[in-house]
Amino acid sequence: MKQKIIQKIKQQIEAGIYPGASFAYYQDGVWSDWYLGEANPEIGEQTREDLVYDLASVSKVVGVGTVLTFLWKEGKIELDNSIRDYLPEVDYPDITLQQLLTHGTDLDPFIPNRDQLSEDQLKDAMFHLNRREKRAFLYSDVHFLLLGFLLENYFEKDLDQILQEQVLDPWGMKETQFGPVSRAVPTVRGQKAGVVHDPKARLLEKHAGSAGLFSTVHDLKIFLEHYLQDDFAEGLSQNFSDLSDKERSLAWNLEGDWLDHTGYTGTFIMWNRQKQEAAIFLSNRTYEKDERAQWILDRNQVMDLIREAD
């Protein structure tokens, strides 16, 4: 079945879906790696081990999602508490941590003139968002931006320092950090490599809970092994949403026993604690074009093959 997955990735590279990909699969206690296609077509650089990628929204689980799960498991926060208990500046006394972690609020993520706002103005705008007619699943970066600000209030530190102390240092993830970074796979042709692709995260830099982390296959292997083995992750393979329209774990998408998170730049990670399997897919699919709807279909083909693998 692994060969079917690799064949599909090769087909997608040949079809121009993305120039190259780094892929790793964990099964029977062993990681297998594949490095396919080109990392930087402009200079003919081949995909290889140790490349640094813009994780985009995979940052949500590597950072904020993991720290909040730690706090919850340690009894330091309650999921049904209001966000205002930890972040008094917000307008949302009725919105809980559980709703934010499962993207189940009624917040309207639209921010007028977003690209003209300063960092402080953008942060303030997220404290006073409009509301939709009713609660429903809506995947949005604002949920994890708010949770990042919550953590900064809770720890009285910048988010980058929190992630360093709570996750990256204890787990030995030395190749993971907020951008901009000096060395990375370029996400868009002609643009400087190492600059954060996501506009809000680019502006908020070390305060962004939604995106902005760069990492490697090596570090994500460490990360996923902790989710497969550590006590804190036990019990996450269940639905935490109180809505009927989408099952979600805390921070993670949930499909059966598989938990996953995807990123806009062409990234995803997956893990299955019951089967003790995991997968890492890193690409720069935004390099030549940005066809998001088609990318979701193509990405899902690879993810479905992983879920079906023996």
Residue ranges of each PLM-predicted region?
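Short, positively charged
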Residues: 1-7, 39-42, 122, 247-254, ...
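Hydrophobic side chains within well-formed alpha-helices
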Residues: 5, 79, 96-97, 159, ...
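Active-site SXXK
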Residues: 6-10, 23, 29, 51-79, ...
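A short, well-structured edge-of-sheet supersecondary motif
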Residues: 9-46, 102-105, 114-115, 252, ...
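Active-site-proximal loop and beta-strand segments within enzyme catalytic domains
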Residues: 18, 33, 38-141
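Short, surface-exposed loop or secondary-structure junction motifs
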Residues: 33, 93-262
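Glycine-rich phosphate/pyrophosphate-binding beta-alpha loops
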Residues: 206-212, 259-271, 280-289
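Short, gly/Ser/Thr-rich active-site loops of penicillin-recognizing serine hydrolases
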Residues: 245, 289-310
